[in-house]
Amino acid sequence: MKVAVLGAGAWGTALAGHLAARHDTLLWARDAALIAGLQARHENSRYLDGIALPDALRYDADLGAALAHGAADDALCVIAAPVAGLRTLFGAMRDAGCVPAHVVWVCKGFEADTHLLPHQVIAAELPGQHSNGVLSGPSFAREVGLALPVALTVASTSAECRERTLAAFHHGAMRIYTGDDVVGVEVGGAVKNVLAIATGIADGLGLGLNARAALVTRGLAEMSRLGVALGGRAETFTGLTGLGDLILTATGDLSRNRTVGLQLAAGRSLNDILGALGHVAEGVRCAQAVLALARAQSIEMPITEAVCGVLFDGVAPRDAVSGLLRRDARAE
């Protein structure tokens, strides 16, 4: 199978390395210097340093060439760009007149200004593209790059997209499950990043494992309430893309969003944290969108609201925790 991976950050690079073990895989990035480094060293020293990539993996900075590689009926196009870049990338596909027949995205979050999920963005930009879906689940790029075991879920309303994604990814140390709850999978992937910031704050303040367990559990309730209101199914949030991804991102020290929370608790400014991180922290980008959607649906999301207070309103992390503890008692 031909596979084009669009986006050579840590996640796109790790997935491309996995795919290249079985398939004719091309990795694209708009940064020609990054591509030149990949071609010379077969290592992404900027985003996934120390991990050798397969010799068979090819690289290109020409979007047209990448789209042509992934646009055949028997090919797959994997979108590994951040949510913030989806609309531009889909628009470029449309303008180039080279829309892949089968598309799966691996980014997580809401579009910041429109509050749309990725499947809504592709519907707006590529209305004729119907074989598409989302691949998500508890996964750190570095561990995938090291070929450690991982389980992910592909969700699509297209059986052909599910089958093609399964055929592409389900080998080696990667296990793929299938489903059709696109909304539930996308909401879980977005909200867990915000909740991971909350858990990082609590851990950074030294509040203990009891507090961590409470935040994860009550955070899952927030995720599920919003997801169901937006059209997802409740059972999705107890699976890999909900609870599984939340546990990993909230507790794993490779988590960028957890790192943001830890650093906020240590008193660092958000700008300094993001500048030093060098990678996207989607929880910061989409926190306000999550809260706005919750308010529009009249859904209480106090943990998310507390995170937004710390990120954007100057609330001290310890004061945000105190605010949560002062909430009125209620039935679970």
Swiss-Prot record:
Alphabetized UniProt keyword annotations: Cytoplasm, Lipid biosynthesis, Lipid metabolism, NAD, NADP, Nucleotide-binding, Oxidoreductase, Phospholipid biosynthesis, Phospholipid metabolism
Localization per record: Cytoplasm
SUPFAM superfamilies in alphabetical order: 6-phosphogluconate dehydrogenase C-terminal domain-like, NAD(P)-binding Rossmann-fold domains
Residues annotated to bind sn-glycerol 3-phosphate: 108, 137, 139, 192, 245, 255-257
UniProt xrefs under Pfam families: NAD_Gly3P_dh_C, NAD_Gly3P_dh_N
EC number of this enzyme: 1.1.1.94
Gene Ontology molecular function terms on file: glycerol-3-phosphate dehydrogenase [NAD(P)+] activity; NAD binding
Catalytic center residues: 192
Cross-referenced InterPro entries: 6-PGluconate_DH-like_C_sf, 6PGD_dom2, G3P_DH_NAD-dep, G3P_DH_NAD-dep_C, G3P_DH_NAD-dep_N, NAD(P)-bd_dom_sf
EC class (word): oxidoreductase
Pathway assigned to this chain's UniProt record: Membrane lipid metabolism; glycerophospholipid metabolism
Enzymatic reactions: sn-glycerol 3-phosphate + NAD(+) = dihydroxyacetone phosphate + NADH + H(+); sn-glycerol 3-phosphate + NADP(+) = dihydroxyacetone phosphate + NADPH + H(+)
Membrane-spanning parts: none
Binding site for NADPH: 11, 30, 108, 141, 256, 280, 282
Domain of life: Bacteria
Cellular-component GO terms for this entry: cytosol
Chief place of localization: cytoplasm
Any one Gene Ontology BP term: carbohydrate metabolic process
HAMAP family: NAD_Glyc3P_dehydrog
Protein task: Catalyzes the reduction of the glycolytic intermediate dihydroxyacetone phosphate (DHAP) to sn-glycerol 3-phosphate (G3P), the key precursor for phospholipid synthesis.
UniProt family annotation: Belongs to the NAD-dependent glycerol-3-phosphate dehydrogenase family.
PANTHER family cross-referenced by the UniProt entry: GLYCEROL-3-PHOSPHATE DEHYDROGENASE, GLYCEROL-3-PHOSPHATE DEHYDROGENASE [NAD(+)] 2, CHLOROPLASTIC
UniProt protein name: Glycerol-3-phosphate dehydrogenase [NAD(P)+]
Organism: Burkholderia ambifaria (strain MC40-6)
Gene name in the database record: gpsA
